[in-house]
Swiss-Prot record:
Keyword Calcium (UniProt): no
Gene name in the database record: zntB
Membrane protein topology class: Multi-pass membrane protein
UniProt cross-references to SUPFAM superfamilies, sorted A to Z: CorA soluble domain-like (SSF143865), Magnesium transport protein CorA, transmembrane region (SSF144083)
Species for this entry: Enterobacter sp. (strain 638)
Protein's recorded name: Zinc transport protein ZntB
Length: 327
């Protein structure tokens, strides 16, 4: 394939444009550089920037049927071969476990043996690892190595996020053993994070597996084996997600049971209190009818005697409840 002039991929508002040196390093692309398979170019764009959007819509370096995908229309992870190039959509993890995971960060890329065009709207933190390796001279040497390193970084971030969720589940389980109910909504958020992760990471694992099995001309056999290892590692993470989802369901049932037991104890206590004071309530009501005068009303110590009788009656009922093992 013929080389590409650096001026053809010069986008003023690009996030960055790197020219790989084929030895693990990279430098900023210049207009007079020649892009070929030995020195591929990585162009990273924010498709919401006007110059980047204009370049994506007009450049002859991209097939017409990938322009919309790179401009943000593609959502779920997938891979499509288009002649000598490949269109790939990936999802990555940004942020912490306290954030809502409704929208994972999407990265779309089209690549062949000479050119890598990646687009995003929000920053992809996993790419910082690849950029740092290139700056230190320990990064990928070609397009195949670049793709493997990016997928490896994305999987590392996903694995770390899954491990954080797993640790939170262990903490919740320990608190439940001590009869401590988690704050309202925390378990629902955790479960939602797990479900959203599984929704997007399952097709992403399939993307990795397909990249490992496809005979792409710019990927070596060793890179395919590494890609298969990444797919297997993400698969183990998905198994961990399934386990965590099942554990959250068990915790939800346990929380409901703990709350029901707490309510039952309170109801039982109120019932015993009502049973203790029911005889005294009956007597005070009976003595207060006043149809024939209050019994003992003319006796000097009548009220005191009545109070003593109530105390004895309440004590007797309490003793009977204790003897019957109701208290």
């Amino acid at each position: 394939m013929e080389g590409i002039k650096g001026s053809e991929v010069n986008v003023p508002d690009a996030v960055f444009a790197w020219l790989l040196d084929g030895k693990g390093g990279a430098r900023h692309l210049e207009d007079n550089d020649v892009i070929d398979s030995e020195h591929p170019c990585w162009l990273h764009l924010n498709y919401t920037h006007p110059d980047s959007a204009q370049w994506l819509a007009s450049t002859p370096l991209l097939p017409n049927n990938v322009r919309d995908a790179l401009a943000g229309d593609s959502v779920r992870p997938r891979v499509s071969r288009l002649g000598d190039g490949t269109l790939i959509t990936l999802r990555c993890i940004n942020g912490s476990t306290d954030e809502r995971p409704d929208q994972l960060v999407a990265m779309r890329l089209y690549m062949d043996e000479r050119l890598i065009v990646s687009t995003r709207q929000r920053k992809v933190l996993a790419l910082d690892d690849v950029v740092n390796d290139l700056k230190e001279g320990t990064g990928p040497a070609d397009c195949g190595g670049w793709l493997v390193d990016v997928c490896d970084a994305l999987t590392d971030h996903a694995s770390e996020f899954i491990e954080e969720l797993h640790d939170k589940i262990i903490d919740l389980e320990d608190n439940l053993l001590d009869q401590h109910i988690p704050p309202r909504g925390s378990l629902a958020l955790l479960r939602k994070q797990l479900i959203v992760m599984r929704r997007y990471m399952t097709p992403q694992r399939d993307v990795y597996a397909r990249l490992a099995s496809e005979r792409l001309s710019w990927m070596t056999d060793d890179q395919r084996r590494r890609m298969q290892d990444i797919a297997d590692r993400l698969g183990r993470g998905l198994d961990e997600i399934d386990s965590c989802i099942a554990r959250t369901a068990v915790m939800s049932d346990e929380i409901a049971q703990v709350m029901q037991e707490s309510l039952s104890r309170r109801t039982y206590t109120m019932s015993l209190m009502a049973m203790v004071f029911l005889p005294s309530t009956f007597l005070t009501g009976l003595f207060g009818v006043n149809l024939g005068g209050i019994p003992g009303g003319g006796y000097q110590f009548g009220f005191s005697a009545f109070c003593i009788m109530l105390v004895v009656l309440i004590g007797g009922v309490a003793w009977w409840l204790h003897r019957s093992k109701w208290l």
